[in-house]
Amino acid sequence: MNPSFEDPRLNAILTKIDAQERLNTEDGLLLYRTPDLLGVGWLANRVRERMHGNKTYFNVNRHVNPTDVCVANCKLCAYGKRTRDGKAFTLTHEQIWHKAGQGYSEAVTEFHMVGGLHPELTLDWYCEMLRGLKQRFPKVHLKAFTMVEIGYFAKRAKLSTRDVLIKLKEAGLDSQPGGGAEIFSDRVRRIICDHKLNGDEWLDTARTSHSLGLMSNCTMLYGHIETEEDRVDHLL
């Protein structure tokens, strides 16, 4: 049964959803600006039910971040630190493997690992980290390295992003997180994260990752200087 929307403009969105048509910029802006929050929620659930029925899942993971040292110095970031900062940390392989094992049980399904753009850690160092984790926890899914990290690894190793991803996958990488996407708007990125990959570079790296059989997601950082138009463009 279809609802009686408080905002009748949502009927056009429902028609597109049921026809499995892709929404456009105007549709996205309407969904942001309509006062009919319950109507938007109903539409979202309509899509969820069509795609997944009543299935859902819970993931038990551990975050194991190897370092917070980062050369990027993004204005939005409260995580990254300079090497000379007394509070900065960089774990050894042994410390990483030990931390992953703390509180480990068969219920743990994933290790989630991201870090700063460290000026001294090499691609081989990260590959050895992955191999050590796979040897110790062969059943655990390794989700690691944002597209931004991959771009930095490639730059430092003087390799293509594809070659970097191949090496990491061979070492045990199973998938990637979606961090570093922020907002794809060039205008916004120049202000909040000008040292990171631009939007096109981020997406190109993700496409390369997917072409190699790796899966990833994509985050969106909002609530700062971006516009509603920037958000919709990011989602599309």
Predicted regions and their residues:
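Flexible, acidic/Gly-rich N-terminal and inter-domain linker regions that tether
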Residues: 1-63, 67-71
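Short, intrinsically disordered, charge-balanced linker/junction segments flanking boundaries
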Residues: 16, 233-236
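N-terminal pre-triad scaffold of radical SAM enzymes
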Residues: 39-84, 88-114, 176
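Conserved Radical SAM active-site core
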Residues: 83-234
